[in-house]
């Protein structure tokens, strides 16, 4: 029994390593069939079983609606000897009325593989409010932001007002003002003479339903 358990753990490590290698190589995870072929498992149901156990152990995250959506957690990365790359979580920003900005890191978050080349220029914020719901940004979501001081019309940005308050809105530079446009038909835009762009939203993480 002990030998079987050891063999199962070894196979699961092989699965973890293969998923990691393929994401690093291609930018997206392998299919179940590709995993099976790589670790010498002919049955897709056996592969599914290994993935289910890895998920239960907290070593991977999966989206049941997307077959390829497999992601190693920080614990999964550490299991195969990889130190996860992280970006700072700088607190909360509003998608409604502007609120005071938070600049000190309250936590650190594993960086998605497709953004690792930009790791030093990224930070995360938790969104509060519902003014960006038409853009798919919900209350409680965490947005990944690339630090930059300029923006193109239509970009979703984190902007600082003259009162040192930050907000998440869609940016438009118009003739005599800057318009920070919410993505909610019930809300009016914010019109300002000047804003400071803290960064552009380049990704989103949701850990709630």
Curated annotation (Swiss-Prot):
One of its GO terms (biological process) is negative regulation of DNA-templated transcription. Its EC number is 3.4.21.88. InterPro entries: ArsR-like_HTH (IPR011991), LexA (IPR006200), LexA-like (IPR039418), LexA/Signal_pep-like_sf (IPR036286), LexA_DNA-bd_dom (IPR006199), LexA_repressor (IPR050077), Peptidase_S24_LexA (IPR006197), Peptidase_S24_S26A/B/C (IPR015927). One of its GO terms (molecular function) is serine-type endopeptidase activity. Residues 32-52 bind DNA. The keyword RNA-binding does not apply. Keywords: Autocatalytic cleavage, DNA damage, DNA repair, DNA replication, DNA-binding, Hydrolase, Repressor, SOS response, Transcription, Transcription regulation. Homodimer. Represses a number of genes involved in the response to DNA damage (SOS response), including recA and lexA. In the presence of single-stranded DNA, RecA interacts with LexA causing an autocatalytic cleavage which disrupts the DNA-binding part of LexA, leading to derepression of the SOS regulon and eventually DNA repair. This is LexA repressor. It comes from Enterococcus faecalis (strain ATCC 700802 / V583).
